[in-house]
A protein has these predicted regions:
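N-terminal "arm"/small-domain region of PLP-dependent enzymes with the aminotransferase-like
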Residues: 1-56, 489-491
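Conserved PLP-enzyme active-site core in the AAT-like
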Residues: 2-10, 31-34, 41, 53, ...
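Short, glycine-/Ser/Thr-/acidic-enriched flexible segments
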Residues: 27, 165, 220-221, 236-238, ...
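Conserved N-terminal alpha-helix of the aminotransferase class I/II PLP-enzyme fold
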Residues: 38-80
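Conserved C-terminal alpha-helix-loop-beta "cap" of PLP-dependent enzymes
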Residues: 290-395, 441-501, 508-522
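Terminal helix/beta-alpha structural elements that buttress the NAD(P)+-binding lobe
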Residues: 524-536
Length: 536
């Protein structure tokens, strides 16, 4: 071993690489929090309570968290939102129940479905175009999924991700109304939204929008240590005893007091200074987004883009930097190239790399110097790019808040053809349709594409994974039932789920993602030459 983990971390801390990625503390906590963490790394000693049976200080801390967010009950979680997801699904769904699930859910949701042998009724999030951020889940799709489930076995829960990794939000108030009308529980994976609801400049949290169980990762977007998360209960549709029962199963019996202290410090900081923190954060974001008028080729997929494309709201703290249609020296310029150049030349590490865009993840702890470095880097990179002729941009004047988005809709079914939104960039794709237009106008076309892309399910996830199986070459697996996941990570959403029939179209997509350098997980053979299938 050339370096220990500590030596490597210490080396990184002393470098000038700027962290446009989680965790949210952004290495800025030295003066705000504690220095020598080992001094507070204790176990359940006298007067320090027990997270699994809180009666003292930890009970008080969780009650403070509930009050801060507006939940009825809140639980500390020290092994990530994954634990919260497993707990939420298991508490609501019993063995063999049906759950309505958004296809872009995190892999932990699929693992929960495996553990409870759940029947899954999928709903497809809206998609503008391959390679762009996935959109919201529409209420109509949820209504149809619940109705389909009722023909066989009524769904006990609906689970979806909002905001998405890229920051796109679904219409939680309208969705909650529909879910509750079908006597189901709404679970929202809000892992990327722990910072929501503390400022009018940011979208509201699902905690205050009618969801029943909400899971948040504190560490992703707020100043807290990695793995720290919260599970909120709102209303009386969920059995608290079952929630506590499954928390006792999934959460470690040795919770870290260092992590819990980090959570406490984070939440009290937000409670005391949220106005000043989020005001300063918003000013930095507004200043950053002015770069949109200066970029000729790179496009920032912001909240105006999300509204025009999906009629959905977007979290401005997620900076989506899109290079679709960009070229350099006669060759296509990809998201992978952008992220590599930002790191190698400008010492900026981004959160996620997709085929045509990268995500720079921000928080209240980001510095003006960090934003300025990113702006300078993007301006310089943009000056060296050109665009494919069919994707030339039209620039119009509009500041970050220059286009006033209307108040949150009651329902996403509301007619939107009268909404006239000026965007800074109307990015035209190869077909000539503008990303600035509402791409959901041709709903029948979109639904047909979703049906064509849908996978045929032969077994539940548990049946497939526990079945007799063997590894075969991918070309021999076409038409057979998969016993493995194929997951694009990050963000962690599966392309293929155990129990689904492997298609040639899927094989081609996997090869394409592999070619462009995306990280694919879930299969034993990391070279993706072979895959495990169910055998009779």
């Amino acid at each position: 071993m050339k370096q220990t983990l500590y030596e490597k971390l210490d080396e990184l801390a002393k470098s000038d690489i700027y962290p446009f990625h989680m965790p949210g503390h952004k290495r800025q906590l030295q003066d705000r929090q504690f220095g020598d963490t080992l001094k507070i790394d204790i176990t359940e000693i006298s007067s320090f309570d027990d997270l699994h049976e809180p009666e003292g200080i930890l009970k008080e801390e969780q009650e403070f968290a509930a009050g801060l967010y507006g939940a009825d009950h809140t639980y500390y979680i020290v092994n990530g939102s994954t634990c919260g997801i497993l707990t939420a699904v298991s508490a609501v769904c019993r063995w063999g129940d049906t759950i309505v699930m958004a296809r872009n859910c995190h892999k932990s949701v699929y693992h929960a479905a495996y553990l409870q042998n759940l029947q899954i009724e999928y709903i497809e999030p809206q998609r503008y175009k391959e390679g762009y951020p996935v959109g919201p889940v529409f209420t109509k799709e949820i209504e149809h999924a619940l109705q389909r489930a009722e023909q066989k076995q009524a769904a006990k829960a609906v689970i979806l991700t909002s905001p998405t990794y890229e920051g796109v939000l679904s219409d939680i108030p309208a969705i909650a109304e529909i879910v509750h009308a079908h006597h189901a529980v709404l679970i929202v994976d809000e892992a990327h939204g722990a910072h929501l609801g503390f400022s009018t400049e940011f979208p509201q949290s699902a905690v205050r929008q009618g969801a029943d169980l909400i899971v948040q990762s504190l560490h992703k977007t707020l100043p807290a240590m990695t793995q720290t998360a919260l599970l909120h209960i709102c209303g009386d549709r969920v059995d608290m005893q079952r929630v506590q029962y499954y928390l006792d199963i999934y959460e470690t019996s040795s919770p870290s007091y260092v992590m819990m202290a980090s959570m406490s410090k984070c939440l009290h900081l937000i409670g005391e200074e949220k106005d000043s923190l989020f005001s300063a954060f918003d000013e930095k974001l507004q200043d950053f987004y002015e770069i949109r008028e200066q970029l000729k080729h790179i496009t920032i997929l912001d909240e105006v883009w999300a509204w025009n494309t999906y009629h959905a709201y977007m979290d401005p703290s997620k900076i989506n930097i899109c290079v679709a249609g960009c070229m350099r020296n006669g060759s296509i310029y990809t998201g992978k190239m952008l992220s590599a150049e930002l790191l190698e030349k400008y010492h900026i590490e981004t959160e996620m790399t997709a085929e045509q865009y990268v995500i720079a993840m921000t928080s209240v702890m980001d510095t003006q110097e960090g934003f300025d470095r990113l702006k300078a880097a993007l301006r310089e990179i943009d000056s060296k790019l050109s665009v494919i002729e069919s994707r030339k941009s039209t620039i119009t004047r509009s500041g970050y808040m220059g286009t006033e988005l209307p108040p949150r809709r009651i329902s996403d079914e509301e007619e939107n053809t009268d909404f006239d939104c000026k965007t800074e960039k109307n990015v035209k794709n190869n077909a000539g349709r503008s990303a600035g237009q509402n791409s959901m106008l041709n709903v029948e076309e979109e639904e047909a594409e979703h049906r064509a892309d849908s996978m045929q399910t032969a077994y539940t996830i548990r049946e497939a994974m526990d079945h007799k199986q063997k590894a075969v070459d991918w070309r021999d697996a076409i038409g057979r039932v998969s016993a493995e996941f194929v997951i694009v990570y990050p963000p962690g959403a599966p392309l293929l789920v155990p129990g689904e029939v492997i298609t040639q179209e899927l094989n081609e997509k996997v090869r394409h993602y592999q070619k462009v350098g995306l990280n694919l997980q879930g299969v034993q053979d990391r070279t993706l030459q072979r895959i495990c299938i169910v055998t009779e």
